[in-house]
């Protein structure tokens, strides 16, 4: 229960990986890892695509495929372990929905089994509008970070030309920079990091 450290009491999935670690999914409170008698919890605020975890399947490359009310999402088990060890602060997950061919993003998970691994390695997940079949071998990833493009910039709500470099006087406030990333794969899920220097 939550008194013992579990992320939520409404458990929807329990998966034991090949090392004997238990991964426990909840209705809407995220996922817990149970290892060596201790819980580590993962939520949307930590990088999960959704806090619903109805079923967990693992592919040969070490990725978890998880069904939820927002579709199916994929997360690297190694990243989950690194997060638990404190070596990273955020998990990367990729969501799949109607734009990827699902008829409904609302997966079913109130009963077991909420997923099925076929002999060909594909995963079957029940949804409100039929079955969603995932082939992990057909997953296309983009190993190169997308090119970041600065679209415009303003200082104290006035547009400034930044193309040849810019110096901002001391005391100026409200600096806004609009930027985007260019990618043809899952562009709506690009995550940015930034750092102010100086």
Regions found by a protein language model. Give the residues of each.
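Residue-level "micro-hotspots" composed of small/polar
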Residues: 3-15, 27, 40, 44-198
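Surface-exposed extracellular loop regions of Gram-negative outer-membrane beta-barrel proteins
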Residues: 30-35
